[in-house]
Amino acid sequence: MPPKKKKLAGIIKLQIQAGQANPAPPVGPALGQHGVNIMEFCKAYNAATESQRGNVIPVEISVYEDRTFDFKLKTPPAAKLLLKAAGVQKGSAEPHRNKVAKVTMDQVREIAKTKMEDLNANDIDQAAKIIAGTARSMGITVEA
């Protein structure tokens, strides 16, 4: 007989600094309410993201009814990648009036390649348009 499939109790989505998960909020309370072993998750997440230190890495945690879990790492948010490429701390408070930085289309394509697996796009050109739209909404000008 095939093994029984575990029943899903919930999905938790978090954005945590790579290699820096700890039981403090927001990680502890989010996992605690589902009865997950918090330290076990922190150790597994930190080991999986050690090579990406300095980035915020979104994670989707599937919690099962027997309190076990598994997680899937996503790519860093497009906004964070754009800020890093533009060399600024934060986007514009008035994006369509005040532009805070400029990025080239090559930089946008590079970010699109990184984000491709998480974007709802069929090819790099469509993904680049999505990233360019994010840049515009942050007050970052995209130069052709």
Curated annotation (Swiss-Prot):
Forms part of the ribosomal stalk which helps the ribosome interact with GTP-bound translation factors. The keyword Phosphoprotein does not apply. One or more lysine residues are methylated. One of its GO terms (cellular component) is cytosolic large ribosomal subunit. Transmembrane segments: none annotated. GO terms for biological process: translation. GO terms for molecular function: large ribosomal subunit rRNA binding; structural constituent of ribosome. Belongs to the universal ribosomal protein uL11 family. Keywords: Methylation, Ribonucleoprotein, Ribosomal protein, RNA-binding, rRNA-binding. The lineage of its organism: Bacteria, Bacillati, Actinomycetota, Actinomycetes, Mycobacteriales. This is Large ribosomal subunit protein uL11. PANTHER family: 60S RIBOSOMAL PROTEIN L12, LARGE RIBOSOMAL SUBUNIT PROTEIN UL11M. Pfam families: Ribosomal_L11, Ribosomal_L11_N. It comes from Nocardia farcinica (strain IFM 10152). Part of the ribosomal stalk of the 50S ribosomal subunit. Interacts with L10 and the large rRNA to form the base of the stalk. L10 forms an elongated spine to which L12 dimers bind in a sequential fashion forming a multimeric L10(L12)X complex. The keyword Ribosomal protein applies.
